């Protein structure tokens, strides 16, 4: 059974409270429950991890290489400036899909650039929780690591 890591970065623990006009009122727990149900239906195992700390996310990426078939990464604001996180994604051999709940290109100018995207397998933005499902589906529909 494929095993996917769902890695959420800073402020995603505040889903449901932070900017509900942008991110909605559903919580991180709601997201995890929906993804867990989705994964059961397609026989995929998911592991969830969230941190507001760059080093914790980097450690999780390094450790993931031996444990997972793919990573769905929502780096939050780190996507715009964390070269350390970018280098961690580039340094591992398993594919990473960058996901954002909102569309950063439709928001403030500083959000328009991702330093992660050039080293990720792909990027899905602006589709809310559905973006995570699409990323998981990608891993299920491809055999390449």
From Swiss-Prot:
It is an enzyme of class 4 (lyase). Pfam families: DHquinase_II (PF01220). The keyword Amino-acid biosynthesis applies. InterPro entries: DHquinase_II, DHquinase_II_CS, DHquinase_II_sf. SUPFAM superfamilies: Type II 3-dehydroquinate dehydratase (SSF52304). Pathway: Metabolic intermediate biosynthesis; chorismate biosynthesis; chorismate from D-erythrose 4-phosphate and phosphoenolpyruvate: step 3/7. GO terms for biological process: amino acid biosynthetic process; aromatic amino acid family biosynthetic process; chorismate biosynthetic process; quinate catabolic process. Keywords: Amino-acid biosynthesis, Aromatic amino acid biosynthesis, Lyase. The active site is at residues 23, 100. The record marks 18 as: Transition state stabilizer. Its EC number is 4.2.1.10. This is 3-dehydroquinate dehydratase.
């Amino acid at each position: 059974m494929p095993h996917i890591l769902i890695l959420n970065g800073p402020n995603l623990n505040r889903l449901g409270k932070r900017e509900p006009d942008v991110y909605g009122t559903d919580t991180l727990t709601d997201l995890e429950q929906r993804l867990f149900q989705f994964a059961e239906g397609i026989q995929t195992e998911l592991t969830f991890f969230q941190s507001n700390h760059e080093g914790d996310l980097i450690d999780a990426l390094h450790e993931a290489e031996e444990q997972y078939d793919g990573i769905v990464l929502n780096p939050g604001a780190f996507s715009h400036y964390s070269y350390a996180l970018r280098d961690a994604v580039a340094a591992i051999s398993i594919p990473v899909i960058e996901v954002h709940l909102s569309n950063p290109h439709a928001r403030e100018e500083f959000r328009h650039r991702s330093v992660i995207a050039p080293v990720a397998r792909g990027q899905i933005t602006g589709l809310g929780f559905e973006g995570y499902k699409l990323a998981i589906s990608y891993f299920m529909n491809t055999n390449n690591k």
